[in-house]
């Protein structure tokens, strides 16, 4: 028997859809669902087997550990936020937003979940799927850039319009999109989180072959963003630093305790930038959050505020 769920937290996708669809002549979407039920919207409980993923889902991979964490939360508290769906056929529904909740609910052993059934056209479904994914906290920079580019392509948006739709600055959106210009090898390192956005941006000024070589060394040797910036500047100035199997001499490259290193990685993934933990004696230490420019700092603050709000 399923555990009774607490009162549902009905939350929309913010002003993103309003900015995107309202300005393009589509139906305007209120800032939050809680302010009033949308026309044609029905709150229901459906069997998990009645739902299927959307063909417009831009996210290709979902972290198994993160799904397991969400499943544990659902076991304890139930599904707080309903899954948004649209009807496909008799007794079958397509997930518009909330596929992670659906998958985690299956892991948690639930047989039914709360849903909001909406009457939505393909255009709106695409917009909701893209915006939900872009606003997620655990996307790597390349996934964000790819989702933003698809949003721009689907709706013929300028960078400024895309920024308004997802609640980012225009500069932050433009910087993310530049990552798509990088060679495949560097994009792969970004995808696997072996490089950060700051590393990749420093490499944009170099020729593709040289950028690829420097990126591989940076990932293998664990260079900091500052180290990569310094070496890229040397190449741009006509100097050729030796990058053959030399580890950075920066104190930050000293080996960390396994548990500290694991914590640093987890925090870095959550905040989207490098995080260093300097753990001293008697349990004292420092937590250092690195940022290469104000856009990166902006992103860190957004993620921290989102955590506090939740």
Swiss-Prot record:
What SUPFAM superfamilies does the database record attribute to this sequence? Answer: ParB/Sulfiredoxin
Function (record text): Involved in chromosome partition. Localize to both poles of the predivisional cell following completion of DNA replication. Binds to the DNA origin of replication.
Q: Which SMART domains match?
A: ParB (SM00470)
Concerning PANTHER family, the annotation shows: CHROMOSOME-PARTITIONING PROTEIN PARB-RELATED (PTHR33375:SF1)
Question: Region Disordered: what ranges?
Answer: 1-35, 239-259
| Key words of the record | Chromosome partition, DNA-binding
Family assignment? Answer: Belongs to the ParB family.
Per the UniProt record, the source organism is Xylella fastidiosa (strain 9a5c)
Please give one Gene Ontology molecular function term for this protein.
DNA binding
Q: Name one GO cellular component term.
A: chromosome
Instruction: Name the Gene Ontology biological process terms.
Output: chromosome segregation; positive regulation of sporulation resulting in formation of a cellular spore
What's the protein name?
Probable chromosome-partitioning protein ParB
> Which NCBIfam families has this protein been placed in?
parB_part
Organismal lineage: Bacteria, Pseudomonadati, Pseudomonadota, Gammaproteobacteria, Lysobacterales
């Amino acid at each position: 028997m399923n555990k009774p769920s607490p009162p549902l937290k009905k939350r929309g996708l913010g002003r993103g859809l309003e900015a995107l669809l309202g300005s393009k002549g589509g139906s305007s979407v209120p800032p939050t669902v809680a302010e009033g039920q949308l026309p044609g919207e029905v709150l229901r409980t459906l069997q998990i087997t009645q739902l299927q993923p959307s063909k417009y889902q831009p996210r290709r991979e979902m972290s198994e550990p993160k799904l397991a964490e969400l499943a544990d939360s659902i076991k304890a508290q139930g599904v707080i936020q309903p899954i948004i769906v649209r009807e496909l056929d008799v007794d079958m529904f397509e997930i518009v937003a909330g596929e992670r909740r659906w998958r985690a609910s299956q892991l948690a052993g639930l047989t039914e979940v709360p849903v909001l059934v909406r009457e939505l056209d393909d255009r709106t479904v695409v917009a909701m799927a893209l915006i939900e994914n872009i606003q997620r906290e655990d996307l790597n920079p390349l996934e964000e850039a790819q989702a933003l580019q698809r949003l721009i392509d689907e709706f013929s948006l300028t960078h400024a319009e895309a920024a308004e739709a997802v609640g980012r600055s225009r500069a932050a959106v433009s910087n993310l999109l530049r990552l798509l210009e990088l060679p495949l090898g560097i994009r792969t390192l970004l995808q696997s989180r072996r490089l950060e956005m700051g590393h990749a941006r420093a490499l944009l000024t170099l020729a593709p072959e040289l950028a690829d070589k420097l990126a591989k060394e940076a990932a293998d040797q664990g260079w900091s963003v500052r180290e990569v910036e310094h070496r890229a500047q040397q190449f741009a100035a006509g100097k050729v630093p030796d990058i053959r199997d030399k580890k950075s001499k920066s104190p930050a490259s000293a080996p960390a305790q396994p548990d500290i290193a694991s914590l640093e990685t987890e925090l870095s993934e959550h905040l989207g930038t490098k995080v260093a933990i300097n753990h001293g004696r008697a349990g004292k230490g420092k937590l250092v959050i690195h940022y290469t420019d104000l856009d990166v700092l902006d992103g860190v603050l957004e993620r921290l505020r989102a955590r506090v709000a939740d």
